[in-house]
UniProtKB/Swiss-Prot annotation:
It is found in: Cell membrane. It is a multi-pass membrane protein. Signal peptide: none annotated. This is Uncharacterized protein MG447. Its main location: membrane. Keywords: Cell membrane, Membrane, Transmembrane, Transmembrane helix. Pfam families: MatE. InterPro entries: MATE_fam (IPR002528), MATE_MepA_subfamily (IPR051327). One of its GO terms (molecular function) is antiporter activity.
Length: 547
């Protein structure tokens, strides 16, 4: 009797959060907390990069730093690369070195983000649907299967990514071409090899303990499905503020340099993880959650459900994973085109784009936070079979994303663009106008990335997983690959490297418009037909049965 009453109270508590006379207000109730969650998470990464750039090299901010231009030169002279001093006038310095380390590490960081949401996101979608239709068995299956499979998957992928991480970093700087032209610039060769070595240490720390942020992500999705918006809006942002303090202490007052950032990141992830655990223990004691530890059983994994979870999460994995590939190819081609079309050092434009790309990533992450809030509401409504409300959600989401994106772009690119670049990324006065021009171009992605991804979450939530994969890969591969070679050819033909800078935004715009059209057409013309007469496709029937 008590268990029935407890289940009723849990369901009533959750229903009160999801139900509202105004659907738009319900969406805002979920999107605003996830927006701030994503904003603070991205802001941590953003500020982390700024503090590394500001505090690691010796300057007025850190006069005791051991990382100086001279220390870089001295290390070069003591290396096997040193032949003469003739290459020391290449313009490379310690600040460019640090920016290069951060830049070539970013694709692997994006890949880790893709891995982190693969199982957790699909689990969250299934969990929300099960709560929407009050399916107690499916709720417990999703919780049990999601927790165990996330843990196992996290441990396996850590070792897998570690096995190829250094080779990936090599490719980012096109190391093979440097080796073929060793005599051309021995200091450049030394510079890039050292950057790869330091970046390897940096990513090894993050990869080796990636299970911690992965489990935190699972708890985030499941807590959101239960309507824990207040916790999500307050505790993770506080944890990120603590992260920032730890980064400052390690990069400013230790000799770890860039590595201090990775150590601080892991400590911050651990704090966030412990906050979720403590909160869940509290909810368990008061019997206010479906996420009960006593119901976890290692021998009761529903493998059919795990397949469905993986199929749903695959779209987000494809999106983030393909974006990692996009960044890798973009950086590698940019370095090669800089050599081919300019007299600048190989990483001049790569380091100049550090600020614009970091700001763009911050803005896009915040907008993706909105989508996560929408995904939870949409999954819940799908569980209730309220298809008309899902249509409205799809339209509201595009409007919300464009509105927030416009506000962020006006603030970070137009109003305060130069101030951010000069104050936080140490862009010199002579390069400031060019960097700001690049920033205006690169940040324009924000209008298209999330609005296009809205179609992905719509297809994920309504069991059309193949369509969600297509949407994800359209942005990451289908559009990018042909554009990559088109922009490379135009850049070489015109001998103008600035043409290539437009590639990321052109890719986001074209893919975003295609995906928006695809999602809206399906929602308004085919959705009712699909649910009135579900197709007999074996994959769709399998997902419908086990989700």
């Amino acid at each position: 009797m008590n268990s029935k009453r407890d289940r009723f109270e849990k369901q009533l508590l959750i229903k009160n959060v999801f139900e509202s006379k105004q659907l738009f207000l319900t969406i805002l109730r979920f999107t605003v907390p996830t927006f701030f969650f994503a904003l603070f998470s991205a802001a941590y990464v953003f500020i982390d990069q700024i503090m590394v750039i500001k505090f690691v090299p010796r300057s007025e901010l850190n006069p005791d730093s051991i990382f100086t231009d001279q220390s870089l030169i001295d290390e070069f002279k003591n290396s096997a690369f040193y032949k003469s001093d003739s290459f020391l006038s290449s313009g490379l310095n310690i600040k460019q070195f640090i920016k290069t380390v951060l830049n070539i590490s970013q694709p692997l960081i994006v890949l880790l983000n893709a891995i982190n949401i693969f199982i957790p996101l699909g689990t969250g979608v299934i969990f929300s649907k099960a709560i929407g239709r009050n399916d107690q068995n499916k709720i417990q299956e999703a919780w049990n299967t999601g927790l165990i499979s996330t843990t196992v998957f996290g441990l396996i992928t850590q070792f897998l990514v570690l096995s190829f991480a250094k080779e990936w970093l090599h490719y980012n700087l096109d190391q093979s071409s440097f080796e073929q032209n060793f005599q051309a610039n021995s200091f450049q060769q030394f510079f890039n090899k050292k950057a790869i070595d330091v970046a390897s240490e940096y990513v090894y720390i993050l990869i080796g303990l990636n299970i911690i942020p992965m489990l935190s992500r699972l708890f985030f999705y499941l807590a959101q499905s239960e309507g824990r918006q207040l916790f999500i809006a307050i505790v993770p942002p506080i944890a990120n503020l603590i992260n920032i303090l730890i980064v400052f202490l390690l990069v400013r007052y230790s000799s770890l340099g860039v590595i201090g950032s990775a150590v601080a990141g892991i400590l911050g992830y651990l704090i966030n993880f412990l906050a979720y655990i403590i909160y869940l223990i509290y909810l368990n004691k008061r019997n206010l959650t479906y996420l009960t530890f006593k119901t976890i059983k290692l021998n009761k994994i529903d493998f059919n459900l795990l397949v469905v979870v993986s199929l749903i999460g695959m779209a987000s994995f494809f999106r983030n994973g393909s974006l990692s590939i996009v960044t890798t190819f973009y950086e590698s081609f940019l370095v090669n085109l800089t050599k081919a079309t300019t007299d600048k050092n190989d990483v001049f434009y790569l380091t100049l784009l550090t600020g614009p790309i970091a700001i763009s990533n911050l803005a896009s992450a915040a907008i993706f936070g909105l989508l996560q809030g929408v995904r939870t509401v949409s999954s819940y409504k799908f569980g209730q079979k309220k298809y008309d409300e899902i249509k409205k959600i799809n339209i509201y989401t595009v409007i919300i994303c464009i509105s927030f994106g416009s506000l962020i772009y006006l603030l970070t690119a137009v109003a305060f663009g130069k101030q951010i670049l000069s104050s936080f990324f140490d862009v010199s006065d002579q390069n400031l106008d060019l960097a700001n021009y690049f920033s205006l171009i690169v940040q324009a992605q924000v209008f298209f990335v999330a609005t296009g991804a809205n179609s992905q979450q719509y297809f994920q939530n309504t069991n059309r997983v193949l369509y969600s994969w297509i949407v994800s890969l359209t942005h990451g591969l289908f559009v990018f690959i042909p554009l990559l070679f088109i922009f490379q050819a135009i850049t070489l033909q015109t001998n103008n490297i600035e043409v290539f800078i437009w590639l990321l935004t052109a890719n986001a715009a074209l893919a975003g418009l295609i995906n928006i059209a695809f999602g809206q057409i399906h929602t308004n013309l085919f959705m009712d037909k699909y649910f009135a007469n579900p197709p007999q496709n074996k994959l769709v029937k399998f997902i419908e049965k086990y989700s």
